[in-house]
Amino acid sequence: MSYLDEMFGLDGKVAVVSGGAGAIGTVMSEALLKAGAKVMVWSRSQESIDLALERLSTVPDSKGRLAGLQVDAGSEEEVLKGLEKTAESLGVPDILINGVGGNIGKAPLIEQDMEIFEKVLHMNLVAGLMVPTKIFGKYWIENKIKGSIINLTSMASYNPLSGVWAYDAAKSATLNLTMGTANELAEHGIRVNAIAPGFFIGKQNKALLIDQETGEYTERGKSVIAHTPYGRFGDVMELAGATVFLASDMAAGFVTGVSIPVDGGYLIHNI
């Protein structure tokens, strides 16, 4: 076994990637697969799962190490059933990626639709962290499993973005809860960390960053580039390294409660 395989290899590991059919979730799933882990992709949409599995099945030697499951991560009952089904089909999971999240629209404070506000909070904070972390944490403690949880924080975890009130609140809370849950679960050998993606153009934010008529950057898109020392948007594949690092007990066995920005320097633009 090479040094890199020993340090970063995930052979024998079983990962659940909640929200694993999204753009970021698929990349994280692919990274874990390539590092040797078995991967169960969770999503509410079977169609999305099928599309993700079609792509992920091209990873060499993925047969028998890859599956998908329709799970609502905001439901304690469904998450527990999903965990049990994963254990039956791939083995007991010891890695959890909390990848559910997103935003719906943008509005001035006084025009914010509170129904949408609550929906975004639920998506990012309840389904995107609390429910899976609670269920997996309990299962791991009862079965004496030293697991690893990776949450998704955001640039909004550190500084609020304009007009996305619920997303700002949820991602700030995600950073706080990453530290809080890491502190509480540490005595059980469970690590909790996060990755904070910078600005990556995807389905949910494309309209905010790129003018759909001209194909040019919007004013917001230009502002992001101007505040990013690397001078560009990120590529989702650039999240793979941090994913494998945090999942590895050898490489990150003494790392817990941290959020790793993968942002091209966005957070230090004012230095």
Q: What positions do the PLM features span?
A:
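Active-site helix of classical SDR
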Residues: 133, 170, 178
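Alpha-helical segment proximal to the catalytic Tyr-Lys
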Residues: 138-141, 183-187
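Short C-terminal tail/terminal secondary-structure segment
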Residues: 2-6, 103-106, 244, 250-271
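Substrate-binding pocket helix/loop in short-chain dehydrogenase/reductase
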Residues: 107-109, 113-121, 224
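Conserved glycine-rich cofactor-binding loop
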Residues: 14, 21-22
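C-terminal helical subdomain
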Residues: 128-131, 194, 216-251, 255, ...
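Active-site loop-to-helix junction immediately N-terminal to the catalytic Tyr of the SDR YXXXK motif
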Residues: 112, 160-168, 180, 208
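Residue(s) in the substrate-gating loop at a strand-loop-helix junction
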Residues: 154
